[in-house]
Amino acid sequence: MAAAATTFFLIGGGTDSGGDSAARRTLTSDEANRLAITRFLNYQAGGRAVTITVPSAAGGLVVTGSVDYRAGIGYGVVRGAGRDTSSDGLIQWTAAAVLVHPMTDTPATAPPAPPASGWYRRPLQKSGSALDSSLAIVLGLGSDRPDNAELLPQNGAALVGKDRVRGHSVDVMTGPNVRANDGTSFAPGSNSSSTVRYWIGGDGTMYRVRAGVASESQPVVIDFDDRKYFPVRAAPGVTPAG
């Protein structure tokens, strides 16, 4: 059955801390090519280690874990601040479902093998949840083929600055509105005035993504860590996409 489409309006705004505020300009051919392959490189790698900082008026959440871009599944530890500490525990998600495993003493990293029991499952919400929107966005940051480099500048992609992320020199680029499907589609070239911001290395490696979600005034920040990626094992009852 075809997956129902869901659109998240992602808006990159504000200033980039630690970055060079260079004048906005159209992407060069090399820059467009790097932006075009960045999602494909995530898929080609199999997966990436990620840290997702989710905004919330109650305090916010941080998810630390891994995303398997070929299987379409993420897994990690979720920790909250302020009133959001009640969300602490393990989390696993696909494009269709979110599973949480509450823990009073949450480990720094998720165990390689998910617990056999104690999971609470719910559908991934299409709107109204900054966490669920963030999880869906992360899954969409991998693609089994490059994007069209020629269309990116035509649709408004631009270079907005330079920065350093954990010692890596990066270019900060914007892309138009990003459309995430109920699968793993995430198209930087979608035609819209809204933008998402990417921190891209000289070889096309994606180091950071920042995007707004409709339910919060602050953006979600997705950092692709230098930690080693470990393949994600599905929790009981979870069927990976791959």
PLM features per residue range, with description:
Residues M1-S66, P231-G242:
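N-terminal leader/targeting segments and the immediate start of mature chains
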Residues H168-A241:
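Gly/Pro-enriched, hydrophobic low-complexity segments
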Residues R70-G140:
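An acidic-aromatic
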Residues A113-H168, T239-A241:
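Solvent-exposed helix/loop surface patches that form functional interfaces
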Residues V54-S56, G80-G82, A95, T104, ...:
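A mature extracytoplasmic/lumenal domain signature
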Residues S56-L61, G82-D88, S215-E216:
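Solvent-exposed loop/turn segments connecting transmembrane beta-strands
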